[in-house]
Amino acid sequence: MVQRSKSSANWLREHFNDPFVKQAQKDGYRSRASYKLLEIQEKDRLIRPGMSVIDLGAAPGGWSQVTSRLIGGQGRLIASDILEMDSIADVTFIQGDFTHDEVLQRILEAVGDSHVDLVISDMAPNMSGTPAVDIPRAMFLCELALDLATRVLKPGGDFLIKIFQGEGFDVYLKDVRSKFDKVQMRKPSSSRDRSREQYLLGRGFKG
């Protein structure tokens, strides 16, 4: 039998005792991350019926489930992740590494000539536990997501992204502020206290 490390055992204990994990199982959501988006939605009313949305870092599908329900049958949702994701009705899923150009091109092809109202990203790299390694990797994903958003958003569109405080954050924040009318930070209660993650919200893309 493989012995679990102490940190692994602690994570499992925290995971299964987590009230948001239990609530997700009860509500039929695929991950506790659904509640982060739901809390932001309750405050900011980002997602509305009929919208076109891109969901980056979508697997296992918690944010896509929430978004699909809120945009309804007249909306359009394109989701992407490096990992597999079980299908969700009316969601176009593109599997692949977002850092590769061919995956970006597939997303752009799915968007087509019509632009989107909202880009959301819960992407994070595989964490090593070493901030000097993890933060630059995370910021690289954030930069790629912002680049995509500037290509596909309609003027007035919105952008929501997971971001980690650390090197490169201030420069990135300045860049987002130059492209959106209003920029705010969100830390949902369902985000674990010890996590460095926050969510950056850009409203009103300047186009």
From Swiss-Prot:
<keyword id="KW-0949">S-adenosyl-L-methionine</keyword>
<dbReference type="Pfam" id="PF01728">
    <property type="entry name" value="FtsJ"/>
</dbReference>
<dbReference type="InterPro" id="IPR029063">
    <property type="entry name" value="SAM-dependent_MTases_sf"/>
</dbReference>
<keyword id="KW-0698">rRNA processing</keyword>
<feature type="binding site">
    <location>
        <position position="97"/>
    </location>
    <ligand>
        <name>S-adenosyl-L-methionine</name>
    </ligand>
</feature>
<feature type="binding site">
    <location>
        <position position="81"/>
    </location>
    <ligand>
        <name>S-adenosyl-L-methionine</name>
    </ligand>
</feature>
<keyword id="KW-0808">Transferase</keyword>
<feature type="active site" description="Proton acceptor">
    <location>
        <position position="162"/>
    </location>
</feature>
<feature type="binding site">
    <location>
        <position position="63"/>
    </location>
    <ligand>
        <name>S-adenosyl-L-methionine</name>
    </ligand>
</feature>
<comment type="function">
    <text>Specifically methylates the uridine in position 2552 of 23S rRNA at the 2'-O position of the ribose in the fully assembled 50S ribosomal subunit.</text>
</comment>
<dbReference type="InterPro" id="IPR050082">
    <property type="entry name" value="RNA_methyltr_RlmE"/>
</dbReference>
<dbReference type="InterPro" id="IPR015507">
    <property type="entry name" value="rRNA-MeTfrase_E"/>
</dbReference>
<feature type="binding site">
    <location>
        <position position="61"/>
    </location>
    <ligand>
        <name>S-adenosyl-L-methionine</name>
    </ligand>
</feature>
<protein>
    <recommendedName>
        <fullName>Ribosomal RNA large subunit methyltransferase E</fullName>
        <ecNumber>2.1.1.166</ecNumber>
    </recommendedName>
</protein>
<dbReference type="GO" id="GO:0005737">
    <property type="term" value="C:cytoplasm"/>
</dbReference>
<dbReference type="GO" id="GO:0008650">
    <property type="term" value="F:rRNA (uridine-2'-O-)-methyltransferase activity"/>
</dbReference>
<feature type="binding site">
    <location>
        <position position="122"/>
    </location>
    <ligand>
        <name>S-adenosyl-L-methionine</name>
    </ligand>
</feature>
<dbReference type="InterPro" id="IPR002877">
    <property type="entry name" value="RNA_MeTrfase_FtsJ_dom"/>
</dbReference>
<keyword id="KW-0489">Methyltransferase</keyword>
<keyword id="KW-0963">Cytoplasm</keyword>
<comment type="similarity">
    <text>Belongs to the class I-like SAM-binding methyltransferase superfamily. RNA methyltransferase RlmE family.</text>
</comment>
